[in-house]
Amino acid sequence: MHSKIQTTLAVHALRALLGLALCALAVAALLVFSVVSHAAESFDDQSFKQAQAAGKTILVDVTASWCPTCRQQRPIVEQIEKEKPNLVVYEVDFDTAKDTLKRFRVQHQSTLIVFKGTKEVGRSTGDTDPARIRALVAQGF
């Protein structure tokens, strides 16, 4: 009888452990897919200069986690990234990248800056209209 109780407890413990493992796996999958769907790189000066030297079209996306306008811009920028594989997108965190903000003369989050190589060709702040954001990015192509 004692052995049967131990076996039953072991089975319940294994089921609970399996349930926890499946939950952890589901959370990990969600995190991976959210990272994969969002291809923008965090701003890196060396990488930015290399992209400029190569004459690439670059979008600098100044964003903040607390910014509702930035959250509205995010899916638009992600869609443009998918449509334009030659576009290089860098995210600049408004709250932590103060030197980068000074360099680009940015005073507000939700600022989008487009470069063609070393030349800035367009800039907008606070725009959430997909057509206008697409037109802004198109200036770099």
Q: Which residue stretches match the model-derived regions?
A:
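Thiol-based oxidoreductase modules, predominantly thioredoxin-like and allied folds used
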Residues: 85-98
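Structural micro-motif
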Residues: 104-113
